[in-house]
């Protein structure tokens, strides 16, 4: 019997989840919930139905796991605890500093209703977090490094678009090659924010806008650009569409450590991702964890979980015997 999936929110992430379900034979998309008028939302799965978010509660016995595809700033802090009262839920909450409080609010709602809520699923947080944990457990004497890119940062692109005089923009985060090599060589460097990444902005300005002012506003923006070496390119709308319409991303999680009685041996653990589509990859991780949420809840588990709490075997459609035979 298929695991019945619902999607809440049908943007880049929601569409990615729909595509990922197509590649997982044990999952079935039943419903997409939207804040828009349902008749205006066209989905790809002919056997699924689009509903208003207001109708979600009526579907609580027809959906095994709801994958919540909202934004971390304002949507998920409200939506995940709210829907954990009705469903097993998965989200991709990625505001690292606020994960503990988000966990607590989802945990209270999910425990009360007897559901599972797996939060902060994706690649960072998510797959990168897991690799940091494994590497820390194995190389206890060492240092962690995370590099992001080269890729489009959605949050930084949005921040540039909000600047006066900007019509559209894309921002790329780029690892500094020399810093990456020093880490890979086991040199254990102490790196500042500026030494690890650069930022590159491609900006379409409004007609007659003050380009020097826009460039200054970008480069001095606190929390986003002021701590980085930032390059700004002004280009046409056509160039932006032609050359920068994709959403690629990726990065590296590296731990460099020492073993031996006198710390005489060096080791480097590296995990890397190179993604054509950031939302489609994130969606694929969400779908694997939806399977895990269903299985864990069937066993009687409830409450909030993170990727740290989910045993790897729960993620895979194959059973234990098959995994031991083919993957171990």
Question: What are the residue ranges of the model-derived segments?
Answer:
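C-terminal substrate-binding/catalytic lobe of Rossmann-fold NAD(P)-dependent oxidoreductases
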Residues: 4, 15-16, 23-54, 152-290
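Glycine-rich Rossmann-fold phosphate-binding loop(s) that bind the pyrophosphate
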Residues: 10-11
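Rossmann-fold NAD(P) dinucleotide-binding segment
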Residues: 56-65, 73-92
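General beta-strand structural signal in soluble alpha/beta enzymes
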Residues: 91-92, 117-121, 147, 170-171
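Rossmann-fold NAD(P)-binding glycine/threonine-rich loop
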Residues: 93-117
């Amino acid at each position: 019997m298929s695991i019945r999936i619902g999607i809440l929110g049908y943007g880049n992430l929601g569409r990615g989840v729909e595509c990922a379900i197509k590649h997982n034979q044990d999952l079935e998309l039943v419903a997409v919930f939207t804040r828009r008028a349902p008749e205006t939302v066209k989905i790809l799965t002919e056997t699924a139905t689009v509903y208003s978010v207001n109708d979600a509660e009526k579907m609580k016995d027809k959906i095994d796991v709801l994958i919540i595809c909202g934004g971390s700033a304002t949507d998920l802090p409200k939506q995940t605890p709210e829907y954990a009262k009705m469903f097993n839920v998965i989200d991709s909450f990625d505001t690292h500093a606020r994960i503990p409080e988000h966990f607590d609010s989802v945990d209270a709602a999910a425990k009360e209703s007897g559901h599972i809520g797996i939060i902060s699923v994706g690649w960072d947080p998510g797959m990168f977090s897991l690799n940091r944990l494994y590497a820390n457990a194995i190389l206890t004497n060492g240092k962690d490094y995370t590099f992001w890119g080269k890729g489009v940062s959605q949050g930084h692109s949005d921040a540039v678009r909000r600047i006066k005089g900007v019509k559209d923009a894309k921002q790329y985060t780029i690892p500094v090659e020399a810093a990456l090599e020093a880490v890979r060589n086991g040199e254990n460097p102490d790196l500042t924010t500026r030494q690890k990444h650069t930022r590159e902005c491609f900006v379409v300005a409004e007609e007659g806008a003050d380009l020097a002012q826009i460039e200054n506003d970008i480069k001095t923006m606190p929390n986003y650009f002021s701590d980085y070496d930032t390059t700004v390119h002004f280009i046409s709308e056509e160039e932006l569409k032609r050359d920068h319409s994709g959403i690629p991303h990726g990065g590296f999680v590296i731990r460099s450590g020492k073993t031996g009685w006198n710390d005489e041996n060096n080791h480097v653990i590296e995990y890397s991702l190179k993604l054509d589509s950031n939302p489609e990859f994130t969606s694929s991780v969400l779908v694997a964890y939806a399977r895990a949420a269903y299985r864990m809840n069937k066993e009687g588990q409830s409450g909030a979980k993170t990727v740290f709490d989910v045993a790897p075997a729960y993620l895979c459609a194959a059973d234990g015997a098959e995994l031991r035979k083919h993957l171990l």
